[in-house]
Amino acid sequence: MANKREFPLDRTRNIGIMAHIDAGKTTTTERILYYTGKIHKIGETHEGASQMDWMPQEQERGITITSAATTAFWKDHRVNIIDTPGHVDFTIEVERSLRVLDGAITVLDAQSGVEPQTENVWRQATTYGVPRLVFVNKMDKIGADFDYSMTTLHDRLQANAHAVQMPIGAEDKFEGVIDLIEMKADLYDEDELGTKWDTVDVPDDYKEAAQKAHNDLIEAVADVDDGIMDKYLEGEEISNAELKAAIRKATINLEFYPVLAGSAFKNKGVQMLLDAVIDYLPSPLDVRPYHATDPDTGDAVELTAGDDKPFAALAFKVATDPFVGRLTYIRVYSGTLEAGSYVLNATKDNRERVGRLLQMHSNHREEIPEVFSGDIAAAIGLKNTTTGDSLTDVDHPLILESLDVPDPVIQVSIEPDSKEDQDKLDVGLQKLSEEDPTFKAETSPETGETLIAGMGELHLDIMVDRLKREFKVAAKVGEPQVAYRETFTKETSAQGKFVRQSGGKGQYGDVWIEFSPNEEGKGFEFENAIVGGVVPREYIPAVEQGLKEAMANGVLAGYPLIDVKAKLYDGSYHEVDSSEAAFKVAASMALKNASKSAGAVILEPIMHVEVVAPEEYLGDVMGQITARRGRVEGMEARGNAQLVNSMVPLAEMFGYATTLRSATQGRGTFTMTFDHYEAVPKSIQAEIIKKNGGGVATKD
């Protein structure tokens, strides 16, 4: 018998909580869980007891690494919450959670306003079309300034953000908030952990400011809503319900961002934030249709939410749970799924059985018989499903838009202490790379050592820590290395001829290939321009494969060759001696021969580095950037500090955190994200080739 849905779709919210590191995102989530009755004791992040941060590394470092999903209930609504990390090394976690959310809360620190990582996650949310509310948190903190935070939303994000609340007091005098729609004040009782508050008239000394803010809000809503504009111009009364409905519509259309105030740590304003989630953020029925593709015809299909439609879901995260093994987090877009039934992994075109279904609450779990359209849940039993795969009804295959996964930019070698550790390391690396697509492991063809690659030093630190802790691997870890690449800068043609005839069956493969640079990010493109069968059709795939394998090891210093076009235009074969293997070798010889005149260069990752430091340290900061081969792209004032925008090679950024700390007496901060690849200077290229012991001579 089919199970009954507990909450209708219009009373379901899938939301994420996103912010810059330390803006109080995890504490905000904690309080939401506390007030919705999910937990009975509040856990503080700085004590290492937070509910959502369940990995030991998170509790020790006080930061959120993986996006834990949990379900809470508020005023007859189901709210599925995903807590996302604020550190740039974990952008894949932010990306994958935004991909499956319908709305988000952006948490700001009331003293700092919009910070660099806030800008990154805001941009990502805009890319995925996620409606947002803003919660100006830490209103109790010294230096808290609601108006300044509002200014940063306008100046740094160009967001059409408007206050729907106004704080009463700030710093240690922060007492509560004024609702600018209802025009009432909510004052909190300090002793009741935020569970009790009084709704009273707006205090006299706030009446004038609140009335002005109320009028500003109506004008701002009128700008994005014709119905409100007409009433406003006619001087007609606008009811609170009409105002809220207009704000909801504009928020869902990404034309308006409501701003609220509070202090999660001091338990103030969180219930009003929950009310705003229900009032202004979309249900799965309100968002625009999801894009999918029919794998059989290639036609675009629009998916809309509904239990009566065929099942379609996206696997957005794979995690290994110490008790139940492999968990696959799924977001259901349409249809329903019962535990024990079969699904089609449309991405890989194979059937899998879902053993059990779990509703997750951070790291506690509750078994459920069925999931419905709009739900977020975890499935057990999916052995071959990885992040970004589409799971659908067996008879209705669909491929949903997947995730953008950036390439790793930094790598370290890891050497196990014993044969037993090598086995544990292999298992650990396989599981961790399944969980996190930006984490890669490979064996160096030159040295035979294992290399692990990721998005930054902290990312790799945490992965190594997990290998030691969860998989009990004893290993030595090398110094961080840059993940260089190689490419061609000139067009050239070369022959590759492989002939071996010494009695018995010989080997014969002969190709002429034209190589040319491809656009950045386009990767390798192969073109077959053979006419008249001078290279038989059955050997063409072997030529392409031979090139791919040779490119993986580069031509200068062993780094992968990227962004190259190859056109096979001539060659010859032998009736008896030709084989796929011979043509593979011939193709690799052509690549090697071409590399001498193709202007081969080594590419290095260039990072977008933003440094925020007080004005008096500006000279030192800019000097350090220049000394690290960096280019300063621009500066802007950030409150009483300066933000320096620059492009710096990753190779020069190791140890920068320590340098910046000492140069600014601990007051400077920086964020770093990968931007693009660029050719290294000639002198450095020669050093890299020498260090890696090899390469080919290149003609300029």
From Swiss-Prot:
Residues binding GTP, per UniProt: 19-26, 83-87, 137-140
Residue span(s) of domain tr-type G: 10-285
Gene label: fusA
Protein name: Elongation factor G
GO biological process: ribosome disassembly
Family annotation (CDD domains): EF-G, EFG_III, EFG_mtEFG1_IV, EFG_mtEFG_C, EFG_mtEFG_II
Organism (species): Lacticaseibacillus paracasei (strain ATCC 334 / BCRC 17002 / CCUG 31169 / CIP 107868 / KCTC 3260 / NRRL B-441)
Stated family: Belongs to the TRAFAC class translation factor GTPase superfamily. Classic translation factor GTPase family. EF-G/EF-2 subfamily.
Gene Ontology CC: one annotated term: cytoplasm
Keywords of the record: Cytoplasm, Elongation factor, GTP-binding, Nucleotide-binding, Protein biosynthesis
Function: Catalyzes the GTP-dependent ribosomal translocation step during translation elongation. During this step, the ribosome changes from the pre-translocational (PRE) to the post-translocational (POST) state as the newly formed A-site-bound peptidyl-tRNA and P-site-bound deacylated tRNA move to the P and E sites, respectively. Catalyzes the coordinated movement of the two tRNA molecules, the mRNA and conformational changes in the ribosome.
Keyword Ion transport attached: no
InterPro entries to which the protein is assigned, alphabetical: EF-G-like_DII, EFG_II, EFG_III, EFG_III/V, EFG_IV, EFG_V, EFG_V-like, G_TR_CS
Sample GO molecular function, one term: GTPase activity
HAMAP family the record matches: EF_G_EF_2_B (MF_00054_B)
Annotated compartments: Cytoplasm
